[in-house]
């Protein structure tokens, strides 16, 4: 047909300044009829207010949960970009303001999974959302144009996680498939199950806690934090893991509260279970920048997942990794250039650079990786 639909509008997670933006100049000469946001992660949503500035009347469709999560994440992105403007002298930051997010949100139109909707008021193109199983609110849109069907999976995951159920995609024939392949080159033990991996994690945590150590699990604030808290709760209920205090903070708290708002409104495991009321879950100090106290026997479930500089997990790690009784458990993706990857690749007793503006820290703790991919 003659409709032009934008699918996702992210920011490059490793680039800075304008290099982080998509090549918008390649599409700005033509109109856009609508946009689809498959899920809230910043590599899919991070530049949406920028493109909406060029197309202020363009409707943007997403799930209701993605609407809530993406708003919170974009507001946090403004804060991060503002800090980087001051620290790194990147004058283009922030790409948008808090006020602009509120303004462009008026063109956001949440839609329910499984319900076909028109992408434009003149008709000619429709879309149906299907559950993608990646994080809360993630969808795989199925487009229909002129009797042809196109499916974009977005980030997709087919196994049940602790909270989010596996993808629920249509079985009928489609004409074109646009498929993500994050793990396209990764093999996995055929005996692997998510629960067996959880039991391995619990065993290592028990060894650490029995030896009077503490555990740090660096986590992405949205998605991985909530899945991990639920998994630890499941392990405790199954008597695989002792009752401990789980500490979360900052953006992780905000995202967990949004997950709780949808606990009865989405297709998920543990319907209605409120994560903020899970036994042992504690909020870290409220004052900005204050680190939680390092106490024996605690489990520090802190962002960011890659131990990015200036984040709580990175700053606490500078004290944490010096204790040989402690354990750092990596449960998500670690970019090869990240502090988390440097820690994983180090040997006990080796110095690890966690912050480019500080001295390296000698790693004495245990470090182990576990596979809980959302792809």
Q: Whereabouts are the PLM-identified features?
A:
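Short, basic, glycine/proline-bearing loop/turn elements
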Residues: 32-35, 187-188, 296-304, 365-370
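His/Asp/Glu-rich metal-coordinating catalytic cores
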Residues: 1-36, 41, 45, 50-227, ...
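A conditional alpha-helix N-cap/helix-loop micro-motif detector
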Residues: 41, 194-198, 280-281, 306-310, ...
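Hard-cation-handling environments
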Residues: 201-342, 354-357
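Substrate-recognition/cap regions that form aromatic- and gly/pro-loop-enriched pockets
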Residues: 344-349
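Conserved beta-strand scaffold positions in the cores of enzyme catalytic domains, especially
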Residues: 108-110, 178, 328-330, 364-369
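Solvent-exposed alpha-helices and their adjacent loops that cap or buttress functional pockets
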Residues: 27-29, 168-171, 292-294, 320-321, ...
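Generic long, charged, amphipathic alpha-helical segments
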Residues: 351-375
């Amino acid at each position: 047909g003659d409709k032009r639909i934008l699918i996702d509008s992210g920011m490059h997670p490793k680039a800075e300044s304008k290099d982080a933006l998509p090549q918008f100049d390649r599409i700005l000469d033509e109109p856009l009829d609508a946009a689809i946001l498959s899920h809230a992660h910043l590599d899919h949503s991070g530049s949406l207010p920028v493109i909406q500035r060029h197309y202020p009347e363009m409707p943007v469709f997403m799930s209701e949960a993605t609407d809530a999560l993406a708003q919170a994440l974009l507001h946090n992105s403004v804060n991060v970009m503002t800090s980087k403007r001051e620290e790194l002298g990147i004058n283009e930051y922030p790409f948008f303001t808090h006020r602009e997010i509120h303004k462009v949100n008026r063109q956001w139109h949440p839609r329910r999974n499984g319900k076909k909707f028109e992408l434009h008021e003149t008709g000619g193109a429709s879309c149906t959302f299907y559950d993608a199983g990646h994080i809360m609110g993630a969808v795989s849109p199925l487009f229909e144009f002129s009797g042809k069907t196109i499916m974009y999976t977005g980030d997709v995951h087919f196994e049940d996680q602790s909270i989010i159920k596996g993808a629920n995609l249509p079985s009928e024939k489609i004409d074109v498939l646009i498929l993500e392949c994050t793990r396209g080159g990764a093999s996995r033990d055929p005996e692997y199950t998510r629960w067996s991996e959880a039991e391995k994690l619990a065993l290592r945590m028990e060894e650490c806690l029995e030896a009077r150590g503490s555990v740090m699990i660096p986590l992405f604030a949205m998605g991985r934090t909530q899945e991990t808290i639920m998994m630890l709760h499941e392990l405790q209920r199954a008597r695989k893991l002792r009752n401990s205090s789980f500490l979360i903070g900052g953006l992780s708290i905000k995202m967990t509260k949004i997950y709780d708002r949808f606990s009865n409104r989405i297709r998920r495991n543990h319907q209605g279970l409120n994560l903020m009321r899970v036994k042992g879950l504690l909020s870290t100090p409220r004052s900005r920048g204050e680190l939680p106290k390092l106490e024996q026997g605690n489990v520090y479930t802190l962002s960011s997942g890659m131990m990015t500089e200036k984040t709580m997990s990175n700053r606490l790690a500078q004290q944490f990794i010096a204790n040989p009784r402690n354990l750092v458990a990596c449960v998500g993706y670690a970019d090869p250039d990240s502090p988390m990857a440097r820690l994983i690749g180090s040997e006990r007793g080796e110095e690890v650079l966690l912050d480019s503006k500080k001295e390296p820290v000698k790693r004495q703790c245990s470090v182990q990786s576990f596979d809980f991919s959302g792809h």
